[in-house]
From Swiss-Prot:
InterPro entries: AB_hydrolase_1, AB_hydrolase_fold, AB_hydrolase_sf, Epox_hydrolase-like. Lipase that preferentially hydrolysis medium-chain saturated monoacylglycerols including 2-arachidonoylglycerol. Through 2-arachidonoylglycerol degradation may regulate endocannabinoid signaling pathways. Also has a lysophosphatidyl lipase activity with a preference for lysophosphatidylglycerol among other lysophospholipids. Also able to degrade bis(monoacylglycero)phosphate (BMP) and constitutes the major enzyme for BMP catabolism. One of its GO terms (biological process) is arachidonate metabolic process. This is Monoacylglycerol lipase ABHD6. (9Z)-octadecenoate binds at F80, M149, H306. It is an enzyme of class 3 (hydrolase). It catalyses: Hydrolyzes glycerol monoesters of long-chain fatty acids; 1-octanoylglycerol + H2O = octanoate + glycerol + H(+); 1-decanoylglycerol + H2O = decanoate + glycerol + H(+); 1-dodecanoylglycerol + H2O = dodecanoate + glycerol + H(+). Keywords: Endosome, Hydrolase, Lipid metabolism, Lysosome, Membrane, Mitochondrion, Signal-anchor, Transmembrane, Transmembrane helix. Belongs to the AB hydrolase superfamily. The chain crosses the membrane at residues 9-29. The keyword Transcription regulation does not apply.
């Protein structure tokens, strides 16, 4: 083989080796950095742009795609200890002609975290309303989507600000009062009774606890490498004290059943999506909501746990699209009558 050709392969091999070695080093030494790069990459790939908006001295961080049009904008509220990027797996399957807005909930990721902030569900609803007003998102009624804690906030928001919301999608929402507690809730009550807030299952501080949380929240058993588990923990640990404070606030007497107390005030067309194998919030909550909300459609997903957005993103996106189409067509037909 010609020496120049050999040199070419050596140079090419060396050039390729640099990014490969950088990736391996990141994976082994800085897995949390790799996770941040992953989200950045997916936002860029899906056309989601990150922006900031302020209400007085309070900062909201959000991502968006598209512009307001004749179809309702979609505002998406994430769950406890998550962030706006949790919706990316669903965004992937949503049409690009929809105006999407995913906001970091109060105290999460790029949104202001203040020791003076009211973290109750009512407090969060007021903050989200401030965000909506800042963006003038309620210039025309929008479609509101929320999951878990975000679902609780979304439901209460629709009850408090009915003129803002054209339709509602609640994905396994928190905030309902069950006749009997499931194993997860029983465990939480035991921890509250013993004041062992360090052991809340939804606030992991080791890779092992992170793995347990993933098993609790999902029916699908994801095989997550140890380094990625470590990275997920590393990203969360600096925020765990805040998560504990928030958790104690949303399970307090003031907030615990706030969706239950307001569900009969929800008047907009509503879609409920719930995983049948949810171990965190029992699927019977869907029936409770359906009995209290007049115009309500329930979708129960087989072989799916609490992390509906992570486990069934394509199905979730399709259900949202189909529901929006049915509501939109009904509204158009009413205008023609």
């Amino acid at each position: 083989m010609d020496l120049d050709v050999v040199n070419m392969f050596v140079i090419a091999g060396g050039t390729l080796a640099i990014p490969i070695l950088a990736f391996v080093a990141s994976f082994l030494l800085w897995p949390s950095a790799l996770i941040r790069i992953y989200y950045w990459y997916w936002r860029r790939t899906l056309g989601m742009q990150v922006r900031y908006v302020h209400h007085e001295d309070y900062q909201f961080c959000y991502s968006f795609r598209g512009r307001p049009g004749h179809k309702p904008s979609i505002l998406m509220l994430h769950g406890f200890s998550a962030h706006k990027d949790m919706w990316l797996s669903v965004v992937k399957f949503l049409p690009k002609n929809l105006h999407l807005v995913c906001v970091d909930m109060p105290g999460h990721e790029g949104t202001t975290r203040s020791s003076l902030d009211d973290l109750s569900i009512d407090g969060q609803v007021k903050r989200i309303h401030q965000f909506v007003e800042c963006l003038k998102l309620n210039k025309k009624p929008f479609h509101l989507v929320g999951t878990s804690m975000g679902g609780q906030v979304a439901g209460v928001y629709a009850a408090y600000y009915p003129s803002d919301v054209s339709s509602l999608c609640l994905v396994c929402p928190a905030g309902l009062q069950y006749s009997t507690d499931n194993q997860f809730v029983q465990r939480l009550k035991e921890l509250q009774g013993s004041a062992a807030v360090e052991k809340i299952p939804l606030i992991p501080s080791t890779p092992e606890e992170m793995s347990e949380m993933l098993q609790l929240c999902s029916y699908v058993r994801f095989k997550v490498p140890q380094q990625i588990l470590q990275g997920l923990v590393d990203v969360r640990i600096p925020h765990n004290n805040f998560y504990r404070k928030l958790f104690l606030e949303i399970v307090s007497e003031k907030s615990r059943y706030s969706l239950h107390q307001n569900m009969d005030k929800i008047k907009v067309p509503t879609q409920i999506i719930w995983g049948k194998q949810d171990q965190v919030l029992d699927v019977s909550g869907a029936d409770m909501l359906a009995k209290s909300i007049a115009n309500c459609q329930v979708e129960l997903l087989e072989n799916c746990g609490h992390s509906v957005v992570m486990e069934r993103p394509r199905k979730t996106a399709k259900l949202i699209i189909d529901f929006l189409a049915s509501v939109h067509n009904t509204d158009n037909n009413k205008k023609l009558d």
